[in-house]
A protein has these predicted regions:
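Short, glycine/charged-enriched secondary-structure capping and boundary segments
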Residues: 46-48, 91-94, 124-128, 174, ...
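Pocket-forming structural segment of enzyme catalytic cores
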Residues: 124-206
């Protein structure tokens, strides 16, 4: 076990990116984005990085892509979600889990989303588990920020979930958000610059349509929202999620977030 101690614009009302001309002219380091399906895409997160001048370095270890030995030449790394489990025995799951040690040791920004969050939790010795009553969270659900999140303001009240497993909070981590639903732990921070969320801030309207249209069996699971609530929920809640994501990524990419 690794042991460490130590679809667009939520910019401004005018639609301008909050970046000075000189900052735009400076070359930015690429961001590693780890995806888990052949045709998956990073949604709003990928769009944000492109819009703000960060090249995308997309890796799919499941299909044989190597992960960088160091993040010296990257601004950080994001591991997104997927249909597999952090408890699966597949080699790429082991590779990704152990690789998270690179940003942790180098104190580079890391952001785990859904499966990515669960991989971080597993790396740090926490449990990733199925609900004892076989409940899932699929759709929009309420969350509540908790604890001192000094520079993570404007948390959304409702977020998009698509998972059947949850995680315990690792020892030494700071809880950032909880819920009263089937899986109470929704976000945590660890160490210098690692953040994990159980929900999907990257989800676009097109992805909501695609996920719900292609997986009707998932919507029949205990606790899942009906399809029309996914659509209505996205229209109602996605703008606030994008405001939060924009503010978060601006600070995250610069390694400026402090948790006090």
């Amino acid at each position: 076990m690794f042991d460490v101690k130590g679809e667009l614009d939520s910019e401004t009302n005018s639609g301008r990116a909050d970046v000075t001309a000189s900052a735009k002219d400076r070359p930015r380091k690429p961001v590693v984005l780890v995806l888990h399906q052949e045709h998956s895409n990073p949604g709003h997160i990928g769009q944000w990085f492109v819009r703000n001048g960060y090249p995308l370095d997309i890796r799919r270890p499941r299909f044989g892509d190597p992960l960088p030995a160091t993040l010296e030449h990257h601004c950080g790394a994001v591991i997104l979600g997927g249909p597999m489990s952090a408890n699966d025995p597949e080699e790429f799951i082991k590779i990704e889990t152990e690789w998270i040690g690179v940003p942790l040791l180098e104190k580079k920004p890391f952001f785990g989303i859904c499966l990515g969050a669960q991989l971080l939790a597993r790396l740090l010795g926490a449990r990733v588990y199925l609900h004892p009553n076989e409940e899932v969270e699929i759709g929009y659900y309420g969350i509540l920020p908790t604890g001192p999140c000094s520079r993570l303001e404007a948390w959304p009240e409702y977020v998009y979930e698509w998972h059947k497993e949850g995680f315990d909070i690792p020892a030494g981590a700071t809880v950032l958000a909880r819920s009263s639903g089937a899986f109470p732990n929704q976000a945590f921070a660890y160490g210098h610059a690692a953040f994990a969320v159980q929900f999907h801030p990257e989800i676009t309207f097109a992805q909501v349509h695609r996920w719900t249209g292609r997986s009707p069996q998932r919507l029949a699971c205990k606790g899942a929202r009906p399809r029309h609530e996914h659509i209505e929920g996205h229209i109602a809640h996605a703008p606030k999620v994008q405001v939060w994501l924009d503010r978060f990524l601006r600070q995250w990419a610069r390694n400026e977030i402090t948790i006090a």
